[in-house]
Amino acid sequence: MVSVKGQLHIDLLGASFSIQADEDSSYLRVLYEHYKMVVLQVEKTSGVRDPLKVAVIAGVLLADELHKEKRRRLVQSEEDLLEIGESTERMLESISKVVDEGFVCGRD
């Protein structure tokens, strides 16, 4: 199977270059636009003007965003598992009740 490589031209923080990746070009553009938005936010709010420092701060903010999302999903997964466990417990209680009633009725 031939893998199609996506391409992206980056022109940001005084650097200009092109990259290729094993992702669709449109996906790469979405990532790049998000990164540019974070870079602009850093420039506006921090007062930092050094491109390397801006890039590092933007990277840390994105890592924070990713970490919080992973943690949120983990908490959601744990909540889902608890709910599934409670639902399973209720179903087992209902089944036990029906089975017990069936045995009682069958003996009469």
Swiss-Prot record:
Pfam families: ZapA. It comes from the Bacteria. This is Uncharacterized protein TP_0846. It comes from Treponema pallidum (strain Nichols).
